[in-house]
Amino acid sequence: MHTIFNHVKMIAENGFAKDINFVEKFDPSLPDIHGNKDLLIQVLLNLIKNSSEAIKSNSARGEITLSSSFLSSVRISLPTSNKKIELPLCFSIEDNGGGIDKEIYENIFDPFITNKKEGRGLGLSIASKIIRDHDGVIECGTTSRGTKMSILFPISD
């Protein structure tokens, strides 16, 4: 996943996020994620593009932090199963944009939810579906000082 993060960061730095500072906080000991590389690139590109747009609309000195970590105690119940699963691998994208509007925050992973004039509101919905198809979960935390999107995965067998 770190290779995918670096690939997407390079695309962003050479395109839509030229003026944004990227900070990396990777845990090199994490195991690989097994999945569709192209779909994971699509997810990360969408999240980083959203972060860069939030920063630009907030006119802050832009910074996006890409991080990975091992979370030893994350267990959740999925709606499709009664058993709890462990999702210890966490990959995050955090920005210092203006945060997500309260009016749409609860529904940001639903289709057609957007606060952008040019957007269709499908990016986070598609990202969420892709992560679910990889047996993971995507979470969001937001304040007026920025947003953090975290992707949680199980350890692959």
What are these regions (language model features)?
Residues 135-136, 140:
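Conserved glycine-rich
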Residues 1-9, 67-69:
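A conserved beta-strand-to-alpha-helix junction within the catalytic ATP-binding
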Residues 32-35, 115:
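Conserved micro-motifs of the catalytic ATP-binding
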Residues 61-74:
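Short beta-strand/loop element within the Bergerat-fold HATPase_c
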Residues 86-88, 100-111:
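Short conserved segment of the HATPase_c
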Residues 123, 127:
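Short alpha-helical Gxxx[C/S/T] motif in the catalytic ATP-binding
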Residues 21-31, 71:
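Conserved catalytic submotifs in the C-terminal HATPase_c
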Residues 131-132:
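Detector for a conserved hydrophobic position within an alpha-helical segment of the HATPase_c
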